[in-house]
């Protein structure tokens, strides 16, 4: 059957019951974490049915057409601030998020080992990076944008200066060509990680990328960062950390040089996932569960939570034909 789903037209009623084209069913009976989350099917009291389909990884139907609304693009200043230590960058993130004046559009983070990888790439192939030199003393960095309101660039700069921090060595851009150079910096690290893994695969063909996608609430982020540092530093494994720190969502990318290190990385991944779940966080804040993270979805929601997702799938796909193996193993309800 074909359903036209328009936001604002179909909500779950008080007991949590949906009725769409004669199909009646209750929303999933589990609570979602209070943080950025893309793990499993969305569920919330009085939810709009469109949110059940968004992020459902294709297990409920085939989306044939999407109509979206776009917010006007605003002028902005791009900033990269470097720090002597990673903890200074993390503390400054909290400071930025609490600011009533600056209110950045986003905040991205890069740890010390990540900056070192970019430095090495810039030395070997300066044109591929196309950005200013990173200070040798920098051990962490934040990248963020702030809006230029009413074309008043001076007012935007004054907001930055009101933060009363040392901006020495920072990068700042408002013209498009310079902002592109800063965007190159943003993408340089994940691209360099991919190049590293590709190089290792030449000797060890079954090596693959291993990275986390975890997130927690504001209140739990400091505890998770301390846990990251403790577990990762003890491991002796090479890794980089970067990502969406404004959402308490960092990607830890392991950089194995052989199969033993890859297996050790997988063990550490599981240990960190258990901690994230203990902190009521998400095992997949952005990329979804797919076919490889079934066990972590069940760890997060429990076996009953996964059964609830299967129940919802059976309403729209009773023979379990769509995207078999996505989110949970194949098989009927």
Which residues fall in each region the model found?
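FAD-binding subdomain of flavoenzyme oxidoreductases
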Residues: 1-98
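Short, hydrophobic/aliphatic alpha-helical segments
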Residues: 35-53, 232, 266-280
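C-terminal substrate-recognition/cap domain of FAD-linked oxidoreductases
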Residues: 54-56, 62-266, 279
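Short, highly charged C-terminal tails/helix-capping segments
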Residues: 181, 289-294
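Conserved PLP-binding active-site segment of the aspartate aminotransferase-like
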Residues: 253-260, 292, 296-300
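Alpha-helix capping/hinge segments and adjacent helical runs
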Residues: 277-289, 314, 318-322
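Activity-critical C-terminal alpha-helical subdomain
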Residues: 294-333
